[in-house]
């Protein structure tokens, strides 16, 4: 479903494998690292899964979320040149992990943070802001009509990797204005400051919120994030829901913003004017 390939050498992704039998069918994808330095012979060099999610684990299976069980699966697996020995991992109902991958054959947990429960799960993206020692963590909305509300974008203090502390959330579109518009409403993807020719900022954060559109936040003060721009297009033709569903976002080095609709709206190209 997701992969990270930024250094030309290693592919980091969440996926399954024939030799991995989950203790629960919802837990069938885990972190894998593939060495592609010889592209004619890709080779797995490391893997990690949430303890207790594989048959035969010494740990017991993890308790299920009491409200909406989304499972314990690896999602985004981000690795950056600023800290090539770290991997920033969202693990759905398992929460957020900072992993030590200095030895790719033996990934180790350095820190974890998980507010689910009491909050609904589905930790999706973990974006490190290195100059601030801050993580932006999104929990993806996966139910129409806000049935899994609140799905938030968290601001997490990661100065101590083994003791991460939430200090704020990104301001959400007004729930009373959006939750009944149709489709999903809540956090999803972020512009991830991808290495290479892309827009890079630890101050401007771009996020998609389905029927809440694209939102841009000023994070100069992580304790008080502020919304500074938004884009909510009209319902696209032929959409199965009654509103736009802005799904993903990428910002290039020229400050052109690309975002896509989940269903029928296609690609929107926007110019950043802030």
List each language-model region with its residue ranges:
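Feature marking well-ordered beta-strand scaffolds used for ligand recognition
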Residues: 1-274
């Amino acid at each position: 479903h997701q992969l990270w390939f930024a250094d030309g050498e290693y592919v980091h992704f969440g996926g399954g494998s024939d030799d991995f039998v989950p203790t629960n069918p919802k837990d069938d994808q885990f972190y894998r690292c593939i060495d592609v330095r010889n592209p004619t012979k890709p080779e797995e060099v490391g893997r990690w899964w949430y303890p207790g999610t594989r048959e035969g684990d010494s740990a017991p299976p993890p308790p299920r979320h009491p409200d909406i069980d989304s499972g314990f699966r690896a999602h985004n697996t981000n690795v950056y040149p600023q800290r090539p020995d770290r991997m920033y991992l969202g693990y759905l109902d398992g929460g957020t992990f900072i992993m030590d991958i200095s030895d790719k054959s033996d990934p180790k947990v350095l820190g974890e943070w998980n507010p689910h429960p009491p909050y609904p799960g589905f930790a999706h993206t973990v974006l490190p802001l290195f100059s601030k020692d801050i993580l932006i963590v999104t929990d993806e909305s996966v139910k129409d009509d806000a049935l899994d509300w609140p799905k938030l974008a968290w601001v997490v203090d990661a100065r101590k990797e083994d003791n991460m502390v939430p200090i704020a959330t990104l301001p959400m579109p007004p729930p009373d204005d959006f939750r009944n518009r149709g489709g999903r409403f809540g956090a999803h993807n972020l512009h991830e400051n991808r290495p290479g020719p892309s827009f890079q900022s630890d101050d401007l954060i771009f996020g998609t919120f389905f029927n809440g559109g694209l939102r841009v936040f000023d994070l100069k003060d992580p304790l008080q994030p502020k919304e500074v721009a938004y884009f909510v297009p009209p319902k696209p033709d032929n959409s199965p829901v009654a509103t736009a569903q802005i799904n993903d976002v990428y910002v290039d080095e020229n400050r052109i913003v690309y975002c896509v609709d989940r269903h029928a709206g296609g690609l929107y190209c926007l110019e950043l004017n802030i």
